Curated annotation (Swiss-Prot):
Recorded GO MF terms: copper ion binding; oxidoreductase activity
InterPro entries: Cu-oxidase-like_N, Cu-oxidase_2nd, Cu-oxidase_C, Cu-oxidase_fam, Cu_oxidase_CS, Cu_oxidase_Cu_BS, Cupredoxin
Domain Plastocyanin-like span(s) in chain numbering: 62-168, 318-381, 486-613
EC number per UniProt: 1.-.-.-
Metabolic or biological pathway: Mycotoxin biosynthesis
Binding site for Cu cation 3: 150, 524, 595
Family per similarity comment: Belongs to the multicopper oxidase family.
Top EC class of this enzyme: oxidoreductase
Residues reported in the UniProt entry to bind Cu cation 1: 104, 522
Residues reported in the UniProt entry to bind Cu cation 4: 519, 596, 601
Signal sequence, start to end: 1-23
Glycosylation sites: 136, 304, 472, 576
Gene source species: Cercospora beticola (Sugarbeet leaf spot fungus)
Name of this protein: Multicopper oxidase CTB12
Length: 636
């Protein structure tokens, strides 16, 4: 085993988000459009070395009992990697657990280092117990990203931490679109240099292995969590039947009345009914009482997490990151508007909102004007899916205040619903990158995908992204990894797409009903433009063919969202199916995973491989073919 050497991290807390860009939805301040090219210049810079040690320890994160979790450098939630745009990163992982692992850098494009993307069986072999691995990549694009395990569902056990890359000083920023005042702009610039990433996630009393074990034993699509964590701290709240009914979606409540006693379970979940699981033989006798029907209630010994802000600056900058296993989360702060200025590490034309949606895998950066009472203002976080009423809290403390505000003005209730119809919500798919960036007006190739449960004879928790085949989790153990194979010998299949370098590629994802749900999709290797969506099927062979048959404005080629994680469209009206179209340029050759970021969906098969640039396939360095990224020791 390679010896452990801990290097001091001399890193400054610098941060500002920039990257390509594109447009403005309603509610944005107008501005002269600036168009830039995809990609960022490389800057000569020193090496930043960052080391983490992984262990398994017990934690009671929500006051409902201890369970095993993954600790990074003896802490629950890993340390933040700070770097500057253009820095070369040496990220060393030491695995002291009794299980295999890997680390993926979510949103980092790995344009010249695909062997550091961290997907076992695809870009590397597993990091075995007692082994170490050196990831080596360049911080091409500024912004907030995060590192997390890509082995099994270890993210659900806490294996994640933030990556913050500061941009060039001359990078254009959108703060003048938030305020025309020079003092405000200077304050926002100062606030952004002190930006803090805040992790918000769902949490289960079960480890990821136990969670999947319940799915397998009961043959259900298990979706009932115990709490919401903010920066690793949370509580379990047990609401009354009346309170749950009041916050349950009316359609869901009516279905429950017709099918199963009329209410959510004591944990606020839709019970594991046949209707919602599909036509499978369920074994509900194998579902533990604590899984759905028993709410213990509890609070972390640390209480609610406190976000301290310095009012002398005038503004605060926060980036909310969702590494959760299942749920997109709605977030609001009492008495404060949220000025969204970056999404997925990418500046956007600012949008002012009362509530923001943080998808699993997404990062939402907000400016907050510190002009309210010096007090502890409540931060509210809640599940956005209809399947469970689940909320959590943190506190935004002005200058270390200990008092509650005299006249609080909440924006959302416990279930994440807006208090007033006049309030504004933000979703990442509403964003437009700043400065402007446009996709090509047509694509060189189109791939149509179909997201659905596999159905019989498969299990209730098995999914497909292609319509008929699932990406088996056993691929994590493929040896040699696909990237190290001769790409000419790898056939193009339903689960393996091939593109040519420089091509513009359309991916059209049809989400099958009934009850078509939104899936947070993440493509490794690059961001994508979300160019259109709609209800119903997509019978056309390409976007170009579809344009004459759909209403004007269905597609946006001028200023579409530019994201590394996007939601497919959920059920609309009476249509069973929905469709979502994204476009990207195959600029960076490599073997990239494209998958749903809901961990039970990915482990259940909702993934596939995209081999971009097969005509310019990279040569993998010998260190990554043989020695986990390290150079072999010199022989004397």
């Amino acid at each position: 085993m390679w010896s452990v050497r801990l290097y001091p991290l001399a890193l400054t807390l610098l941060f500002q988000c920039v990257s390509p860009a594109a447009a403005r939805p309603s509610g944005c301040v107008d501005d002269v459009e600036v168009v830039q090219e995809i990609g960022s210049k490389e800057i000569q810079a020193p090496v930043v070395r960052f080391e983490i040690s992984l262990t398994t320890q017990s934690i009671d994160a929500a006051g409902i009992g201890f369970r095993e979790a993954i600790f990074i450098n003896d802490a629950f939630i890993g340390p933040t990697l700070y770097a500057k745009q253009g820095d070369r990163i040496e990220f060393v992982v030491h695995n002291y657990m009794q299980q295999d692992t890997s680390i993926h850098f979510h949103g980092i494009d790995q344009r010249s280092t695909p062997w550091s993307d961290g997907v076992p069986g695809l870009t590397q072999s597993q990091i075995r117990p007692g082994a170490s691995f050196l990831y080596n990549w360049t911080a091409h694009d500024a912004g907030t990203y995060f590192y997390h395990s890509h082995a099994k569902s270890q993210m659900m056990d806490g294996l994640y931490g933030a990556v913050v890359i500061a941009p060039d000083d001359e990078a254009p920023r959108p703060f003048h679109l938030i305020s025309s005042g020079e003092a405000d702009q200077a304050a926002m610039l100062a606030a952004e240099k002190l930006m803090r990433p805040i992790f918000v996630s769902d949490w289960s009393q079960y480890t990821s292995a136990e969670y999947h074990g319940i799915q397998h034993a009961a043959n259900i699509d298990f979706s009932c969590m115990d709490s919401i964590l903010v920066q690793g701290v949370g509580s379990q709240y047990c609401l009354s039947e009346e309170e749950l009914d009041d916050m349950t979606n009316p359609i869901v409540l009516q279905l429950l009345k017709e099918l199963a006693g009329g209410h959510m379970t004591p944990k606020g979940c839709i019970p594991p009914l046949q209707m919602f699981n599909g036509d499978f033989e369920l074994h509900l006798e194998n579902v533990p009482e604590l899984a759905y029907n028993k709410c213990k209630g509890g609070q972390s010994s640390k209480g609610n997490y406190t976000i301290d802000v310095d009012t002398s600056i005038g503004w605060a900058a926060l980036t909310f990151v969702n590494p959760g296993g299942l749920y997109p989360l709605q977030l609001s702060i009492d008495s404060h508007e949220l000025y969204v200025y970056a999404v997925d590490g990418q500046y956007v034309y600012p949008i002012v909102a009362d509530r923001v949606l943080v998808n699993t895998g997404s990062r939402i950066s907000v400016m907050i004007k510190l002009d309210q009472e010096k007090a502890r203002h409540v931060v509210r976080v809640a599940n956005d899916y209809l399947n469970q009423i689940l909320g959590g809290f943190a506190e935004l403390a002005y200058d270390g205040a200990t008092n509650a505000p005299k006249h609080p003005h909440p924006k959302t209730n416990y279930g994440g619903k807006l208090i007033s119809s006049e309030m504004v919500s933000f979703v990442p798919e509403d964003s437009s990158p700043y400065p402007a960036l446009r996709p090509a007006q047509s694509a060189d190739s189109t791939f149509k995908l179909r997201l659905k449960k596999l159905g019989q004879p498969y299990r209730a928790y098995e999914w497909t992204q292609t319509g008929s085949l699932g990406y088996n989790i056993s691929h994590e153990h493929d040896d040699p990894p696909l990237l190290l194979q001769n790409v000419e010998d790898v056939p193009a299949t339903e689960l393996t797409l091939k593109t040519q370098i420089g091509d513009w590629v359309d991916l059209v994802l049809v989400t099958a009903g009934p009850f078509a749900q939104a899936h947070p999709m993440h493509k490794h290797g690059n961001k994508v433009f979300l160019i259109g969506s709609g209800s119903g099927s997509f019978p056309w062979e390409s976007v170009e063919e579809a344009i004459p048959h759909l209403p004007e404005g269905t597609f946006n080629f001028q200023d579409p969202p530019y994201l590394d994680t996007f939601n497919t469209v959920e059920m609309e009206g009476q249509a069973n199916d929905t469709w979502t179209a994204v476009r990207y340029k195959a600029e960076y050759a490599g073997a990239w995973l494209f998958h749903c970021h809901v961990q039970t969906h990915l482990s259940g098969g909702m993934g596939m491989v995209v081999l971009d640039g097969v005509d310019a396939w990279p040569e993998v360095p010998l260190a990554y073919q043989e020695w986990n990224g390290f150079e072999p020791p010199a022989l004397s």
